């Protein structure tokens, strides 16, 4: 099946920030819409092969560079800076794209997929907007970090003296140091991202990948973790929503098996009727 690739912009309703959007639209009969939210320190075109696969199988695939990523920045130095929108802006931007997609294809079911940081965005999204979705896919969700409060305190102190645009190596080390240490001795400091060395090389060489978050970005990240693991504020207008939690068995940044069970069971506690957990063997990202 052929497809059309569309690149456009979307002006955020939160603050007017221009967000870059990519859509891959099948030429034949369309079965549904598959909306993707990417992870931290990457960009939308990394998902293009997957989107082309979806389009070849009859699904509209859509993704935006979330604020502070890819082309959704005012200047290149703003990579990792979320323009003080916080976790709320990430969620509202994603919902805005949902509404635009459903206006184009009002009769089609919409599946929302989030990877890594994006998995926390889509989980927080469903606190308010679960009735927009036919299915939610939570992929590679970071484990709940008990040291979030410590990170928030470091961010607060550094912001006072450095400002919220400061790229904090201390916060980066505190957030990911123990994980990166498990890959010590590998050829690349990004070896954790994939078992395929070509993918790792492309990630390492891209100026749009692997950048350090600003203090503003880390504050949003910590807020996402608090919100998506919290038990309060779930409206749950769609208890029939199907939810799939999935992770690679050897991606140790993400949930261990017990954490997958605990995280999915705690999801919208007592209200979601149908969810599934899947741990995929292997170590490719």
Per-segment meaning from a language model:
Residues 38-42, 116-117, 249:
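Active-site glycine-rich loops that stabilize anionic/oxyanionic intermediates
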Residues 105-116:
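Alpha/beta-hydrolase fold nucleophile elbow
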């Amino acid at each position: 099946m052929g497809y059309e690739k569309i690149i456009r912009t979307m002006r955020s309703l939160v603050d007017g920030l221009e967000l870059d959007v990519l859509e891959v639209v099948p030429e034949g009969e369309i079965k549904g819409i598959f909306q993707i939210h990417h992870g931290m320190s990457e960009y939308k075109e990394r998902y293009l092969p997957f989107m082309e696969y979806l389009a070849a199988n009859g699904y509209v695939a859509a993704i935006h560079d979330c604020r502070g990523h890819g082309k959704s920045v005012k200047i290149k130095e703003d990579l990792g800076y979320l323009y003080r929108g916080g976790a709320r802006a990430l969620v509202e931007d994603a919902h805005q794209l949902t509404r635009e997609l459903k206006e184009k294809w009002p009769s089609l079911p919409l599946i929302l997929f989030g990877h890594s940081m994006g998995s926390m965005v889509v989980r927080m999204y469903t606190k308010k907007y679960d009735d927009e979705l036919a299915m939610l896919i939570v992929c590679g969700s970071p484990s709940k970090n008990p040291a979030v409060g410590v990170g928030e305190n470091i961010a607060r102190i550094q912001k006072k003296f450095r400002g919220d645009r400061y790229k904090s190596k201390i916060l980066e080390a505190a957030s990911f140091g123990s994980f990166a240490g498990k890959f010590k001795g590998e050829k690349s400091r990004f070896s954790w991202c994939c078992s395929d060395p070509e993918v790792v090389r492309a990630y390492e060489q891209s100026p749009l990948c692997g950048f350090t978050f600003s203090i503003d970005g880390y504050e949003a990240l910590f807020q996402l973790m608090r919100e998506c693991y919290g038990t309060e504020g779930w409206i749950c207008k769609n208890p029939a929503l199907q939810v799939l939690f999935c992770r690679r068995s050897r991606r140790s940044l993400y949930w261990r098996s017990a954490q997958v069970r605990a995280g999915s069971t705690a999801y919208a506690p007592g209200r979601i009727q149908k969810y599934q957990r899947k741990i995929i063997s292997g170590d490719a990202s």
